[in-house]
Amino acid sequence: MSFNSNASKYQAENTVDKLFSNILHTSTTSKSVSKSKSKSKSKPKPISSTQLLVNQLQSTNTTANNNNTKRKKHNNNKRINKTLLEEKKFSKFIKYNHIKQKSNKSELDEKYLNKLVRKNINSLNKINKIDDLLIDEELNQIKQELLEENEFVGMGGGQLKGGKRLRKKLLNNTKQVIDEFDGFGEISSSNNNNKKKNSSHPGLTPGLAPVDYEEEDDE
């Protein structure tokens, strides 16, 4: 490239130098700005005490909400299970009454009744785990009566007693046997006297005889 004079050459060189200086200065400035931004991002900002308190409260509220949700879910499941259990018991009750009213019972009906008997006997065994000989005898007697009643129901008559009634009968019979037992294998005389006094005529207050009753009739 040729120049007409030294002045024009000098002017051109100055223009090129300014241009390069501007380019280099801009790039250097942008690099410094990016470095300062990266440094500011890398340094964590200090958290104030107020912000710490807010964060703790939010965490506590979240935990409390989770606990309330779990408790509500547990109660809801418990309510559902209780409803299902009641419906199941009611359906079993309906099924039992339907089978009980049949004159001719099928093999499946007999199996279902036997299952009820076994279930009631198992309930008695769980409630009455006592080694006393007298109570065991009473328990065996109740079991035998339950089996006989089931056979009668299977033939089209009678009703199968529930576990609650059997338990009550068992407790009453056991209490009576224990009260009458004097420890020597005999019934106490006082209880025998009470039985004689209470064995009066039917339909009357114990100890009272009929109006037309006469002592000569006993002779």
Curated annotation (Swiss-Prot):
Keyword vocabulary terms for this entry: Nucleus, Transcription, Transcription regulation
Bias type Basic residues, positions: 34-44, 69-79
Domain of life: Eukaryota
Keyword presence, Transferase: no
Compartments where found: Nucleus, Nucleolus
Residue ranges, annotated region (Disordered): 27-51, 60-79, 184-219
Primary location: nucleus
ATP-binding among keywords: no
GO (cellular component) term, any one: nucleolus
Function: Involved in ribosome biogenesis, probably through modulation of rDNA transcription.
Family membership noted in the UniProt record: Belongs to the RRT14 family.
Identification of the protein by name: Regulator of rDNA transcription 14
Organism listed in the record: Candida albicans (strain WO-1)
Lineage of origin: Eukaryota, Fungi, Dikarya, Ascomycota, Saccharomycotina
Gene name per UniProt: RRT14
